[in-house]
């Protein structure tokens, strides 16, 4: 072991790698179940924000037998257009970039219950798998992530006359070594 402490000792963790390296800084305890619950609250808070803004009438939270959790709402659906600065869909930006979302200006949400949280990108980073399905503008969009990394770009998989967002996630067993049941 070296006793050297100099500029080479300083490590910079960027993006979701920081979340995976130190998950407790973002969601709390990863052993006693509270971190798992925090992840659920993060996704539910986004749906509640749609309801508070007057765009959502129904939120369905399901705990599945495979220890995954899904949250479905009938809000506007996460934006699916290409984000000009990032070059990928706005949905992918929201799911993969810390501190990205529609609650930082005065136009998208007048009321928000979710700003105290860490964001859905943290849930994505700490999930073995996450499925995102968006009903918006007459289309059904879907993207699958593994450990926060998209398998592919957001794709149109069908047509719809509905709107809303569906998120289903499977918490990472590498992160949650203690309590992994909801």
From Swiss-Prot:
Residue ranges that the Swiss-Prot or TrEMBL entry lists as coiled coil: none
A GO MF label: DNA binding
Assigned keywords, A-Z: ATP-binding, Cytoplasm, DNA-binding, Isomerase, Nucleotide-binding, Topoisomerase
Catalytic activity: ATP-dependent breakage, passage and rejoining of double-stranded DNA
Keyword Transcription regulation among UniProt keywords: no
SUPFAM superfamilies, per database record: ATPase domain of HSP90 chaperone/DNA topoisomerase II/histidine kinase
InterPro entries for this protein: HATPase_C_sf, Topo_IIA
KW Cytoplasm (keyword) present: yes
GO-annotated cellular components: cytoplasm
Domain of life: Bacteria
Subcellular location: Cytoplasm
Enzyme nomenclature, EC number: 5.6.2.2
GO biological process: DNA topological change
Family matches, as Pfam families: HATPase_c (PF02518)
Something else known: Few gyrases are as efficient as E.coli at forming negative supercoils. Not all organisms have 2 type II topoisomerases; in organisms with a single type II topoisomerase this enzyme also has to decatenate newly replicated chromosomes.
Assembly and oligomerization: Heterotetramer, composed of two GyrA and two GyrB chains. In the heterotetramer, GyrA contains the active site tyrosine that forms a transient covalent intermediate with DNA, while GyrB binds cofactors and catalyzes ATP hydrolysis.
Listed PANTHER family: DNA GYRASE SUBUNIT B, MITOCHONDRIAL, DNA GYRASE/TOPOISOMERASE SUBUNIT B
Family in the record: Belongs to the type II topoisomerase GyrB family.
Entry function: A type II topoisomerase that negatively supercoils closed circular double-stranded (ds) DNA in an ATP-dependent manner to modulate DNA topology and maintain chromosomes in an underwound state. Negative supercoiling favors strand separation, and DNA replication, transcription, recombination and repair, all of which involve strand separation. Also able to catalyze the interconversion of other topological isomers of dsDNA rings, including catenanes and knotted rings. Type II topoisomerases break and join 2 DNA strands simultaneously in an ATP-dependent manner.
UniProt-recorded name of the protein: DNA gyrase subunit B
Species this protein is from: Proteus mirabilis
